[in-house]
Amino acid sequence: HYPLRRQRQMCIRDRLGVNVAFIMRCRVEGLRDIGMCQNPFGSFNFLLGLETLSLRMERHCGNTMALARYLQSHPMVSWVNYPGLSDHPFHRKANEYFRKDCYGAVLTFGVKGGLGPGTKFIDSLRLASQLANVGDAKTLVIHPASTTHEQLTEAEQKASGVSQDMIRVSVGIEHIDDIVADFAQGLEEARNA
């Protein structure tokens, strides 16, 4: 089943076959999403981003591992979920699939005290931005229980893997000392919530 299945009451898949329908869909949706051709400046930015991707990923991953280790030792943090940590349940699998010391740039952790301290932590950050995105050059954080999953009951949140204390972090390429300092002052504010 394709979302763009009908064109003038004709079922493309039934008339032309699954392969042709898929090819047409790829072409039409691709043109719709990015246009006939990319503009020169967009092409330049894409190429520049692609050329520096490996360097940025090394920094992302190094920062994430350092932040995960810092959070593990912090008294206001109840748990840290990052496959690069040796106590992660899938650490062995992560070693099979990822390059050594490059386990991605997203981690989650729990702030002791639940919802109140979690929201206080997010609101207290100065360097990191509160956004639901991932993969940016800057550090992004979100408290899903009070934002993206707020409309769900606590039981529904728990069923979807979101706890009241959970913070999701997409770690950026800023200097790690700046990231850690921001999280340290945020966790100190959360302690006083």
Where in the sequence are the language-model features?
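Short beta-strand-to-loop capping motifs
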Residues: 109-113, 121, 171-173
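Glycine-centered tight turns that cap/initiate beta-strands
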Residues: 76-79, 127, 165
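Single conserved hydrophobic/aromatic residue that forms the stacking wall/gate
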Residues: 1-8, 12
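Structural motif of enzymes handling amino- and sulfur-group chemistry
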Residues: 13-107, 113-118
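PLP-dependent enzyme catalytic core of the Aspartate aminotransferase-like
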Residues: 123-124, 139-193
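General beta-strand structural signal in soluble alpha/beta enzymes
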Residues: 80-82, 132-135
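Active-site "cap" helix and flanking loop/linker of ATP-utilizing ligase/carboxylase catalytic domains
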Residues: 118-126
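A generic structural signal for well-ordered coil/turn residues at beta-strand boundaries
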Residues: 103-105, 135-137, 163-165
